[in-house]
Amino acid sequence: MSRRVATITLNPAYDLVGFTPEIERGEVNLVRTTGLHAAGKGINVAKVLKDLGIDVTVGGFLGKDNQDGFQQLFSELGIANRFQVVQGRTRINVKLTEKDGEVTDFNFSGFEVTPDDWERFVNDSLSWLGQFDMVCVSGSLPSGVSPEAFTDWMTRLRSQCPCIIFDSSREALVAGLKAAPWLVKPNRRELEIWAGRKLPEMKDVIDAAHALREQGIAHVVISLGEEGALWVNASGEWIAKPPSVEVVSTVGAGDSMVGGLIYGLLMRESSEHTLRLATAVAALAVSQSNVGITDRTQLAAMMARVDLQPFN
């Protein structure tokens, strides 16, 4: 059985990750650096899938001036690289975790995509993405790419690869949902923004998820933070709660969950097994400073500790 996945990250970043007990505004804050990683949501997903034994191809945009860290990562992991290089620098995101687990992001600006860059990307990506079983589109839109252009590309992509996994936020999320991807993973707040109302009870969240499904989206996975995740599809509704772990960094936890979801779906696992796996992969990511799976035994132990129940 073919098991090929592509991930698209239009606006990747170098993640500078650090820890400080408490951020004091207006003061000098001492930060312990825990890592500097070539990252981006789709790239994080690709790392998880590669660790799980899936062949992955990555694509999107990279800034010409500081692409070396990404090229080195792809080479080390054995990931096929279809990124398009554009003028400028890939942005740097600073992510600081405090002792209470709160994460504050400082996302800097990066390269700008010109109309010619975008036209080339659209034509090139649509020429090769159709050969994959699943395509994961993750992250924000870079400067120069309008929500309308993104919706058009997503719609055209769906006609070539029906199984699109989509994970984004803000204007990119709204634009991408219009193309009715196969699976989406908003968090609760993002779902509230889409629904135009507060969703205080789990029943409200499920009703909003079904409203998304009525638009042609087969799978809706709602990230609930420490409370876990809710999955709604034609077969049912399930909620998974992660085990308690020592939080090192929450950076990439959502991307790790997406990687676990894709793996389970590729392997034709049940919804219950897939959600349990994805929740365990996310919990594992929280307990370390970077995404990835280095110990399958540890992952299996984490899966056994996930509390998964059908929602009644």
Where would I find each of the regions flagged by the language model?
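Glycine-rich phosphate/adenosyl-contacting loop at the front of the ribokinase-like
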Residues: 1-59, 67-69, 312
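Hydrophobic anchor at the start of a short beta-strand
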Residues: 5, 54-56, 81, 164, ...
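Short, conserved phosphate/pyrophosphate- and ester-handling motifs at nucleotide-, phospho-/glycolipid
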Residues: 49, 187, 254
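Gly/Ala-rich phosphate-binding loop of Rossmann-like dinucleotide-binding domains
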Residues: 50, 158, 266
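Conserved phosphate-binding/catalytic region of the ribokinase-like
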Residues: 174, 202-312
